[in-house]
Regions:
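Short alpha-helix
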Residues: 159-175
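Short, glycine-/aromatic-enriched active-site segment of Class I SAM-dependent methyltransferases
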Residues: 137-160
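Short glycine-dipeptide loop
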Residues: 129-135
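Conserved N-terminal segment of class I S-adenosyl-L-methionine
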Residues: 1-107, 116-123, 184, 224-227
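A C-terminal cap/extension of S-adenosyl-L-methionine-dependent methyltransferases
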Residues: 169, 180-235
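Short acidic/His/Gly/Ser-rich catalytic and metal-binding motifs that mark active-site loops
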Residues: 54, 144-148, 190-191
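A short His-aromatic
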Residues: 111-113
Length: 235
């Protein structure tokens, strides 16, 4: 991944500071339900960028969180806000921190890596976790017929799409068990009236798509633009 490096977060808006509020709402809706209740859990955020997820975790009371990003200018934004953003590349960092974390979360989509790189990355995450630890990942969802092809073709650093099934396969190849895919929610901004319109329209479309898939003998549960998964390392 050269145009959008996997270990550097690229999705920050032009108003980087303004992004903290929006991304915090997104992360709280999508990630907090999958985190341990223990606020002292050791959490590593890979490709943390300016620290949006770190900020959301801090607001939720998690006190033992560190983020890494390969771009010093992005990490500096979080550092100025008192967030534990370090400048580091993902693969060598994980190699030198084995068995240290309860949770690892990459903020970048897995599909910015090739299949082989993804499996290697997941194995490194597996080794960096404590027994019973978990990883929370996401990638572009190829099961959605409206955006799946565009997701893959959007830039040359998107090497593949996944479905809930193939994302599970990748995590299993990385050594993980108890893989639980979930839909990443886009419409979580409840003060915006258009949020409700988008939620209603996409919910109806996904219901129709599920029915069509059933006619073809396919049982597809996750049809959101992006599909996430939480997976555990054996105890």
């Amino acid at each position: 991944a050269r145009l959008e490096p996997f270990d550097s977060y690229w999705q920050a808006p032009k108003d980087v500071e303004g992004g903290f509020k929006a991304f915090t709402a997104y992360y709280k809706a999508n990630y907090l339900p999958h985190l341990p209740e223990d606020r002292e859990a050791r959490i590593l955020v890979v490709s943390c960028g300016p620290g949006y997820l770190l900020n959301a975790l801090a607001e939720a009371g998690y006190r033992n969180v560190v983020g890494i990003d390969s771009d010093p200018s992005k990490a500096a934004v979080g550092q100025k806000r008192g967030l534990a953003c370090e400048v580091a590349e993902a693969f060598p960092y994980l190699e030198h921190h084995r068995g240290e974390y309860d949770v690892i979360i990459p903020e970048q989509e897995l599909n910015h890596l090739t299949i082989d790189e993804t499996i290697e990355f997941l194995r490194l995450c597996h080794d960096a976790l404590k027994p019973g630890g978990r990883v929370i990942v996401y990638a572009m969802n190829g099961a959605n017929p409206f955006v799946g092809s565009e997701n893959l073709s959007h830039n040359i650093d998107h090497f593949y799409n996944v479905t809930e099934y193939s994302l599970t396969q990748l995590l299993q190849l990385g050594g993980f068990t108890d893989v639980r895919p979930f839909a990443l929610k886009l419409y979580v901004f409840w003060k915006n009236p258009l949020n409700y319109v988008g939620l209603a329209v996409t919910s109806l479309l996904e219901l129709a798509m599920r029915a069509i898939f059933m006619l073809y003998g396919k049982k597809v549960r996750v049809l959101s633009k992006k599909v996430g998964a939480v997976a555990r390392k054996g105890a």
